[in-house]
Amino acid sequence: MRRFFYRHTRGVTEVVVGRGLPYGEYIERPVVLAEEGLRPPIPGAPTLVLRGGEEVKSLEVLTKVYSFLKEVGADRSTTLVAVGGGALLDLATFAAGTYMRGIRLVHIPTTLLAMVDAALGGKGAVDWGPVKNLVGVFYQPAAILCDLSWLETLPERVYRSAFAEVVKYGLALDGDFYSWVRENAKALLARDWGALEYAVYRSLQLKAGVVEVDEFEERGIRQVLNVGHTVGHAVERVLGLLHGEAVAVGIVAELRLSSELGYLRESHVAEAAEVLSSLGLPTSVKATEQQLAEAAALVKFDKKRRGGHIYIPLVVRPGRWILEKIAVEEVEKAVRYVLHQGG
């Protein structure tokens, strides 16, 4: 078992990574939001079971959560425990941050992607109609309990897709960790628990370091967490890939962009593509001409766009990055680099 703490405006968050974690040591007066189909993590605690996926992040479901908290007598001494994937954790963060102006929150992520990404950062949101994350808060959990036991039955494709985020942390923030991931790809795919524990732990340490210095996205430093996501989001929406698969494709596209701009050696692009492939992730995707055009067009609506440019975090070498203003046309070229015509 590994643990660390990170600081923020509300105090300190404890992060624990291991197998068979003793939840009771970290939680007092729990009420639980649990994703449908999961075993009850805290027997006897009042529990509201919800569906997983993006649909849970609605005002209708949020109202249901508020009603549940009121019915069970939740107050500011209560701990809201969120058990599930990233979407449910987002909803729970919003609910905890707004119910009675804030109650204690503990995250128990049950997918690898949620462990290395959504569980840490303090972002909570619900969607408004077709607009994702339109209404949101920053609200840090008191604890994040990454129990690797949940991953034993995670479907293989879903499991593998999360490694795109792990590779991202190494590429952008820690060259030594990137080398470690490259050398331990087989162990990670085999679900070697020692390797997996370190991968989750180090990924969260790196993300926490960013959150500590730019908790509210005011300094531009947190932009580094978007490496691979500018192109990745467009590819995800058009081709229906899993989030991690789309990020993997986006990483290759944005590394190629960095190389063409003279920041990154071409050999690093090829190496990263090889690492992602070794983890079972795509590095390019077949697309129709229409899909290619749609993905390129979506880049124009990226939230980081300012006029005819998009601010993109570019890796300049493993472990180092810069925030660069890139012409939209250049980003569209990057999309076309990883989407090749296949229908």
Swiss-Prot record:
Its main location: cytoplasm. Binds 1 divalent metal cation per subunit. Can use either Co(2+) or Zn(2+). The keyword Cytoplasm applies. InterPro entries: Dehydroquinate_synthase (IPR050071), DHQ_synth_AroB (IPR016037), DHQ_synth_fam (IPR030963), DHQS/DOIS_N (IPR030960), DHQS_C (IPR056179). Keywords: Amino-acid biosynthesis, Aromatic amino acid biosynthesis, Cobalt, Cytoplasm, Lyase, Metal-binding, NAD, Nucleotide-binding, Zinc. Zn(2+) binds at residues 165, 229, 243. It is found in: Cytoplasm. SUPFAM superfamilies: Dehydroquinate synthase-like. It catalyses: 7-phospho-2-dehydro-3-deoxy-D-arabino-heptonate = 3-dehydroquinate + phosphate. The keyword Amino-acid biosynthesis applies. Its EC number is 4.2.3.4. CDD domains: DHQS. Pathway: Metabolic intermediate biosynthesis; chorismate biosynthesis; chorismate from D-erythrose 4-phosphate and phosphoenolpyruvate: step 2/7. Catalyzes the conversion of 3-deoxy-D-arabino-heptulosonate 7-phosphate (DAHP) to dehydroquinate (DHQ). Belongs to the sugar phosphate cyclases superfamily. Dehydroquinate synthase family. This is 3-dehydroquinate synthase. It comes from Pyrobaculum islandicum (strain DSM 4184 / JCM 9189 / GEO3). The lineage of its organism: Archaea, Thermoproteota, Thermoprotei, Thermoproteales, Thermoproteaceae. The gene is aroB.
